[in-house]
Amino acid sequence: NLHYHYSSKEEIVMALWANLDTKLHHWSAVSSSLLPPHIPKIMIDQFRVIWDYRFIFSELNFLLAKDPDLRYRFVKHRDKRMEIILKFCKIMVQRNVLKATMTDGEIRRLIKTVWVISVYWLSYVFTGGEEITFDAMNEGYELVAQLIKPYLVDESILPVSLASMAITSAPTTLQITAGGTSG
């Protein structure tokens, strides 16, 4: 029983969010010299984690509206992550992966757009009555790739589709269970 360890639902959500955030941003521990070849695998891993933690996103707006302190901590944490991603993108500009002509404003807007699609894509698919499958994740990846490609120095470094790659960690269909997903 989580209520034994935490005094409120909000504390549970923040603890779960911290765990989710760590899993979502494991890529930042990967040497940036390995990217972008690993971007497709990172995206699939992120979609899987987001689906596993979908209950947080279904409760998040209600909890944030109800608790100003929780909202403050959540926004501060999210903004910190956005800054980490901004620094990462600037490194990609320095390494001639992203175009040097990108302004900070363009990078920030790209980050926000990719963030929104990455976080909410599977909810969009699920609420539309579709099954959460590798194909659904691939479509989310394709949307993100379409956003990023115009900013790449060499568009060929980012595959248009995961189907063209050997992504072995993603099953053809994810089985939806009460506790999350299984492959």
Question: Where do the model's predicted regions map?
Answer:
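HTH DNA-binding helix-turn interface
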Residues: 3-16
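Short, basic, alpha-helical segments at the C-terminal edge of helix-turn-helix-like DNA-binding modules
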Residues: 17-24
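Secondary-structure edge/capping motif, primarily at the C-terminal ends of alpha-helices
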Residues: 27-31, 57-64, 96, 121-129
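Hydrophobic alpha-helical connector segments
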Residues: 28-56, 76
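Helix-loop "lid/cap" segments that line or gate small-molecule binding pockets
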Residues: 44-51, 59-65, 146-151
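Short, hydrophobic secondary-structure boundary micro-motifs
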Residues: 58-61, 73, 100-101, 160-161
